[in-house]
Amino acid sequence: GTAKLEKGSAAPKVVVTLNKGGERVLNAKNVMLAVGARARALPQIGLEADGDKIWAYRDALAPKKLPKTFVVIGSGAIGIEFASFYRALGAEVTVVEAIDRIMPVEDEEVSKTAQKGFEKRGIKFKTGAKVTKVTKTANGVSVAIEVGGKAETLEAEVCISAVGITANTDGIGLEALGVELDRGHIKTDSHCQTNVKGLYA
């Protein structure tokens, strides 16, 4: 079934809507949330994984086919790992990154050195690039980007979305309880307790 939090007497109660119909209410002194995460989607530009032409990280881990060309959007750990992996398998790979260097959380010197190494292996990079539209085509995907004010279009069989991870916190009742979130992630103290008594994450 699916679960939702509601206000309880001591701690929030968990209301489970059963697959076969009906509900089950669980009361406890403490409730631990372990909701997991999923790949972030950007539907406003057409970047939503479908497992076919637009892949999230899970699709890229267990592909149904081995495409010859890829556009990877995002050059953090996930994007770079898949770009490197599929290039090693012989695919042509272009990585698109919004800021002016790859691997943005790494030291700038590390980013520059890594990019040179990846380029020697044949990976292409478009840095400082804004993705404006991802469109599915008969042969794959078309990725429209802007680099330095100039529009470009990249074509590939598959686009890998590596634009981040988001917590599975939608629709589980956090807002109604007043649970504090930070960009969708549950805020906790040093004991993993949220701002709601008896609710941990």
Question: Positions of the model-derived regions?
Answer:
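FAD-site-proximal beta/loop scaffold in flavoenzymes
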Residues: 48-66, 153-201
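A conserved short coil-to-beta-strand element within the FAD-binding core of flavoproteins
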Residues: 1-13, 40, 127-140
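Short glycine-/small-residue-rich Rossmann-like dinucleotide-binding loops
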Residues: 36-37, 147, 160, 164-165
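Glycine/Thr-rich phosphate-binding loops of Rossmann-like dinucleotide-binding domains
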Residues: 41-43, 80-81, 86, 168-171
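Core beta-strand elements of the Rossmann-like FAD/NAD(P) dinucleotide-binding domain
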Residues: 20-30, 149-158, 195
